[in-house]
UniProtKB/Swiss-Prot annotation:
Gene Ontology molecular-function annotations: acylphosphatase activity
Organism of provenance: Methanocaldococcus jannaschii (strain ATCC 43067 / DSM 2661 / JAL-1 / JCM 10045 / NBRC 100440)
Domain Acylphosphatase-like: 8-75
Domain of life: Archaea
Annotated protein name in UniProt: Acylphosphatase-like protein MJ1405
InterPro entries, A to Z: Acylphosphatase (IPR020456), Acylphosphatase-like_dom (IPR001792), Acylphosphatase-like_dom_sf (IPR036046)
Length: 75
């Protein structure tokens, strides 16, 4: 079995994602996947995720599109 080294990611989410429970859903999903990090709202309307996890978990984080239907862009 191959072990993946954790990497720190800063993910910036753009779209109509504030005041709709998006941050809380992402925090809950991260906890369920065993991802350590923080999710916070910025004044410019973006949501930023700073998290440390192995790259194979990134696919799981973004797999369920129902959590991201309001997302316009992710960087």
């Amino acid at each position: 079995m191959v072990k993946f080294m954790p990497t720190t990611y800063e993910i910036i989410i753009y779209g109509r994602i504030q005041h709709v429970g998006f941050r809380e859903r992402i925090e809950n999903l991260g906890h369920a996947l065993g991802i350590d990090g923080i999710v916070y709202n910025y004044e410019d309307g973006t949501v930023r995720i700073l998290a440390n996890f192995p790259s194979e978990r990134k696919k799981k984080l973004f797999k369920d599109k129902t959590n991201f239907w309001r997302v316009r862009k992710c960087k």
